[in-house]
Amino acid sequence: IPAPEDCYVDGVIEQTDVLAKAIKVVMDEHRFNANNVAFSISSPRLATKEVLIPNVKANKIDKLVQANATEYFPVNMDEYIIQYTVLEKVEDQGQEKIKLMVAAVPSEVVESYYGLAKALGLKVAFVDYAGNSSYQIMKQQIGPEVSLVIQVENDGTVINIFKDNVLQLQRNVPYGKSMLVNAV
């Protein structure tokens, strides 16, 4: 569904009612009914970073990530939501560590999606970031060789490098299809 003009700015849904109406029209046209919605967010304001942490139990990872978030991202953590994905266990200087992909997204970005769900009369099942959603699909589809996966989106490009089915690098580049179209 193409977003109506100026509804979506840097990942924030600015005109919830206009976008909700456009989505409802398409849902009605296709007789699509739902109770839940899952969002996969793409925003130039979303930051990701690979992080190595000590090998701790799974239930301790979140507290460790939250406690060290300001070291990963130099922003006011009161305005951000921090999430992570476990990539793999690695050995670093003779010690077993856990490699994570940590994401920081402004709370206002996530809250705008909850507002859209409310306007649509839907319950949010989960919110993910586009890089992780793509990672979950790609890791099942590529082999053990080094693979470069490039996702060109409207406002940005996500570059993923895999080795042995493990994400080694993921970067968001703020150049996408819209820039190419405008250049032509």
Per-segment meaning from a language model:
Residues 1-28, 183:
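N-terminal phosphate-binding loop and adjacent alpha-helix
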Residues 31-33, 94, 151:
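Solvent-exposed loop and beta-edge segments used for protein-protein assembly and interaction
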Residues 1-4, 35-42, 138-179, 184:
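Gly/Thr-rich phosphate-binding beta-strand-loop-beta motif of the actin/hexokinase/Hsp70
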Residues 36-140:
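Active-site neighborhood for divalent-cation/phosphate handling
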Residues 12-13, 53, 101, 171:
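Short acidic/polar beta-strand-loop edge motifs in secreted extracellular
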Residues 18-19, 23-31, 46, 61, ...:
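Cytosolic/nucleoplasmic/matrix-facing N-terminal domains/tails
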Residues 25-29, 68-71, 116, 184:
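Amphipathic alpha-helical regulatory segments at dimerization interfaces
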